Amino acid sequence: MAKSDIHPKWYPEAKVYCNGQVVMTVGSTKPELHVDVWSGNHPFYTGTQKIIDTEGRVERFLRKYGMSSTQTSGEQNKK
């Protein structure tokens, strides 16, 4: 026999916010979702290259291994 009332509440019109603006509505177990990146501003979909680093990990890696942040990946791979 199945248990009753074990499933979370479902919100079929949950709003997804990015930078304070509603970007889409989806079905979710939460009424509102706040995201930093979505398909409208993701570098893969927009064709731009951007490093999203909120904790300074990229800079720490570059300092640790003596790389400058101005190098591109193509320049690093050349021998």
Curated annotation (Swiss-Prot):
<dbReference type="InterPro" id="IPR042105">
    <property type="entry name" value="Ribosomal_bL31_sf"/>
</dbReference>
<dbReference type="GO" id="GO:0019843">
    <property type="term" value="F:rRNA binding"/>
</dbReference>
<comment type="similarity">
    <text>Belongs to the bacterial ribosomal protein bL31 family. Type A subfamily.</text>
</comment>
<comment type="subunit">
    <text>Part of the 50S ribosomal subunit.</text>
</comment>
<keyword id="KW-0689">Ribosomal protein</keyword>
<dbReference type="InterPro" id="IPR034704">
    <property type="entry name" value="Ribosomal_bL28/bL31-like_sf"/>
</dbReference>
<dbReference type="Pfam" id="PF01197">
    <property type="entry name" value="Ribosomal_L31"/>
</dbReference>
<dbReference type="GO" id="GO:1990904">
    <property type="term" value="C:ribonucleoprotein complex"/>
</dbReference>
<keyword id="KW-0694">RNA-binding</keyword>
<dbReference type="InterPro" id="IPR027491">
    <property type="entry name" value="Ribosomal_bL31_A"/>
</dbReference>
<comment type="function">
    <text>Binds the 23S rRNA.</text>
</comment>
<protein>
    <recommendedName>
        <fullName>Large ribosomal subunit protein bL31</fullName>
    </recommendedName>
</protein>
<dbReference type="GO" id="GO:0006412">
    <property type="term" value="P:translation"/>
</dbReference>
<dbReference type="GO" id="GO:0005840">
    <property type="term" value="C:ribosome"/>
</dbReference>
<keyword id="KW-0687">Ribonucleoprotein</keyword>
<dbReference type="GO" id="GO:0003735">
    <property type="term" value="F:structural constituent of ribosome"/>
</dbReference>
<dbReference type="InterPro" id="IPR002150">
    <property type="entry name" value="Ribosomal_bL31"/>
</dbReference>
<keyword id="KW-0699">rRNA-binding</keyword>
